[in-house]
């Protein structure tokens, strides 16, 4: 599979108490490095249209991953993938709850869901636009630590969890 070489680009792990800047980097690449490479290829006048289109699609996906906190989670539990929980009594894991289960439970298209989200104030938009990828990684990491504290192993999560965390 030609996509296998990008698998390490979907997450970034570093120890609790460290920052991305001070952490040891994955030699295969990580989320931050993947975003940077995509940006470089998209902006490179020597890149052909096919490369630019592929890397633009990948960049959009990686930015989505960056904003799902467990993609900046702990290596030892694979970003919550080994933390078993229940979602409306069905077996799953914490990562899956945050990747898909909460979104699917709204039973809306992504367009409908985005239309129903709270909008940002002008000041919030400006702060987001001034942010860097590293700012977003650090924010996502802080949120990941809160996500870890939000559920216990084998806990049954449902509407209350969605209300509190989505």
Predicted regions: what they are:
Residues 1-60, 69, 74-166:
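N-terminal, motif-rich segments that launch catalysis or mediate targeting to/interaction with membranes
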Residues 66:
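Positively charged, low-complexity nucleic-acid-binding target-recognition regions
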């Amino acid at each position: 599979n030609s996509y296998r070489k990008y698998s390490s680009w979907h997450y970034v792990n570093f120890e609790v108490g460290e920052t991305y800047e001070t952490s040891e980097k994955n030699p295969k690449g990580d989320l931050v490095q993947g975003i940077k490479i995509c940006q470089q290829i998209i902006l490179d006048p020597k890149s052909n249209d096919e490369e630019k289109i592929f890397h633009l699609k990948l960049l959009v996906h990686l930015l989505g991953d960056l904003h799902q906190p467990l993609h900046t989670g702990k290596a030892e539990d694979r970003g919550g993938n080994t933390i078993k929980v229940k979602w409306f009594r069905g077996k799953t894991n914490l990562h899956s709850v945050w990747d898909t289960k909460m979104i699917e439970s709204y039973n809306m298209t992504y367009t409908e869901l985005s239309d129903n989200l709270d909008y940002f104030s002008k000041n919030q938009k400006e702060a987001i636009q001034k942010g860097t990828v590293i700012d977003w990684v650090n924010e996502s990491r802080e949120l990941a630590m809160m996500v870890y504290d939000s559920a216990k192993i084998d806990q049954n999560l449902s509407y209350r969890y969605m209300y509190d965390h989505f």
